[in-house]
Amino acid sequence: MVLLSITLLIAGLAISGITLIAIVLSIANPEKRLWPPHHYTRITPMIVWIPTFTLALILICLGILGWGTLPLPTWLRYGIGIPVIVLSNAAVWYEALQFGMAQTGGAKGTLRTTGFYRYSRNPQYVADSMMVAGWSILSAAPLT
């Protein structure tokens, strides 16, 4: 179990590191940016969603493997963790559907200023972060 957890942790850190490098390179050299893509093709969603869902699966697995390891009270785990996961998941999917899956995956679109975009330029990322926080609280696992 420890070896599996370490392997998953390394894989998750690698995906996160590669993503961070792509973002930094895109900011540093916009003409050769990796994100958002210059041209949206059929493989663009795969490039975006495979690492994203792989990282989510890794976080789920790490939470299951370390379930209940941290001494968090039950009321906190279930009373806060579950509602945060449910509400943030609803926010992500609501905005993704309003935004359009292609534009969410990097296709050109229009500036949105309605819905949660009234409050943040990146509400899906904010909600994704909240979802991870909710899962960390619920699972009470040290590696999430």
Regions found by a protein language model. Name each.
Residues 1-113, 129-144:
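Membrane-anchoring alpha-helices and their flanking helix-loop junctions
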Residues 121-131:
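Hydrophobic alpha-helical membrane segments
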Residues 112-122:
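Short, amphipathic, aromatic/basic-enriched membrane-interface segments that mark the entry/exit
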